[in-house]
Amino acid sequence: MTAIAPPPSPSPVLHDAALALRALLPPGRRWLVLTGAGCSTGSGIPDYRDLEGQWKRPQPVTLQAFMGSHATRQRYWARSLLGWPVMAQARPGQAHAALAQLQQRGWIEGLVTQNVDGLHTAAGSDGVIDLHGRIAAVRCMGCGAGMERAVLQAMLLERNPGWAGLSAQAAPDGDADLEGRDFSRFDVPACPHCGGVLKPDVVFYGEGVPSQRVQAVRAMLQQAGGLLVAGSSLMVYSGLRFVHEAVAQGKPVAAINQGRMRSEDLLALKIEQDCGQIGRASCRERV
């Protein structure tokens, strides 16, 4: 019979980092975890920023531009038609699996994500707050009716069959780099109920996070012993605000992130490692 080797032990660096995270919390207290794009790059979803925190590509469309211009919506949905399959086919990675396991072990008070891919829930995490919504849903900006993004994808393909065979580089959040094309004839479906504008049910740049989500995160933070940021540069205020609030409450803030972060001076600990590897080490060492 062939022997099955046990999984390798984490390196001393990963082991020490996992222990350092545990040591920051008072006995019996748990982390509120705030995740960003670095948790999902291992699942094949591109991120927005480089290690210096700078944009890798032009900034995403704003809510004002999307709502104010039919041409902008044509360009958005044409690119999304090609980029959506990457999101639809993405599966949870090492970071998602580790955080779900740590939550089951009682290490995590709650999980908040700035990502819109739904992979934390797919990995088995409970009660995830999707701060910026989910790309798998679409909502009418007129009557509020919702539909699944997969349903809209079928509508887009039916109306624009010539676009299906185009190739494009995947971009963050179901976008695709598709330049040099004439989008003026791209047929964008309207809401089947009221004829209104359909928009992904995610928070665009220039759009506020719904207040009930912010309050839900604050309630979790009140109960948590500290805030752990995983895979986020904190360049967006919607996540950064909770770092400031944790510090104001006298709670430690730690981060697992590769690259420059905003407000690093507020961190009690920063681990410049892949968040999936640190999560795996934490599971292995039962810290």
Name each model feature, range by range.
Residues 1-284:
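Conserved catalytic core of sirtuin-type NAD+-dependent deacylases
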